């Protein structure tokens, strides 16, 4: 009987160790509201995740229109990574955390830089004020 209890305990222990974290659901559109590394610089960023595809609209303080970058992304547990349409990888793999109410997404880069996004639909004032989609490797200043 004692051996059976030890055996059952061992099975339960191994089963508990085998559980993995579920993927963070980043589906939807997000607006950058805060970034730890930007002090005084103004940047406006919108990100939309749909299926495994993403679109990123970004505009710096000196720009009058948004640049748009398309690509694909994947989520593995709490890690998110991606590639742009030209095949180049994002600058980092990010740790993704969503608030309990699902309205805030926090991405933490390997460098420790933290970006906070609020769930919001990308407005037409952004999508209609966009330079042609950036798809080549010569575009500078990609957000992710």
PLM ranges: what are they?
Residues 112-122:
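Short, structured interface segments
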Residues 35-39:
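Structural motif
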Residues 1-16:
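Sec-dependent bacterial lipoprotein signal peptides
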Residues 17-31, 121-144:
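N-terminal helix-cap/turn-to-beta initiation motif at the start of protein domains
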Residues 33, 57, 83, 106-108:
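Beta-strand residues in well-ordered beta-sheet regions across diverse protein folds
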Residues 26-27, 46-55, 75-79, 95-105, ...:
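Short, solvent-exposed coil/turn segments at beta-strand boundaries
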Residues 103-113:
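Short, exposed beta-strand-loop hairpins at the edges of beta-sheets
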Residues 40-90, 144:
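N-terminal glycine/threonine-rich, aromatic-flanked beta-hairpin/loop signature
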């Amino acid at each position: 009987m004692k051996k059976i209890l030890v055996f059952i305990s061992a099975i339960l222990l191994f089963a508990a160790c085998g559980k993995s974290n579920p993927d963070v659901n980043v589906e939807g559109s997000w607006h950058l509201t805060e970034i730890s590394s930007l002090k005084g610089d103004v940047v406006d960023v919108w990100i939309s995740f749909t299926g495994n595809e993403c679109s990123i609209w970004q505009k710096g303080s000196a720009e009058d229109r948004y640049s748009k970058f398309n690509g694909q992304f994947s989520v593995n547990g709490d890690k998110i990574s991606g590639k742009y349409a030209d095949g180049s990888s994002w600058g980092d793999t990010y740790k993704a955390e969503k608030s309990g109410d699902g309205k805030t997404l926090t991405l933490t880069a390997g460098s420790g830089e933290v970006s906070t996004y609020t769930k919001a639909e990308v407005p037409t004032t952004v999508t209609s004020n966009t330079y042609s989609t950036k798809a080549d490797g010569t575009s500078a200043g990609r957000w992710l």
